[in-house]
Amino acid sequence: MQRGWAHHDSELVNRDSGLMDSLPELRRNLEKTSLNDVVVPIIGDSLVVARHWAGDISMLFIDGGHGPVPAHSDYESWASKVTRGGFMAIHDVFPNPADGGRPPYEIYCRALDEGLFEQHSSLGSLQVLRRL
């Protein structure tokens, strides 16, 4: 979601720093949905945080970079941490390349092809998989 990438929301650019910053939007959404007591945002570089993550995850939401390296790195770093029966949601999954970037679709297919996950549900471009 960085400035200059094919897919980013220019409204998320911090006016002071000029950098993308979705944290205020996340906080507003957690407040609106009364999820502050069950969702704990961890702020940091995805790969650095994954390296130090020790526990299982019951719900993983991948909505990161749309380039091949960031998307596959997120999948490789986090998918194995989802507990059996847990969920992995991937945003911006578009089977038709004309509709959006391919890497989120590629990691979606990879998760199914590797046999670690099964399709659970979908809503628009959001695909939710369940860990086997």
Enumerate the language-model features and the residues they cover.
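S-adenosylmethionine/decaboxylated-SAM
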Residues: 1-132
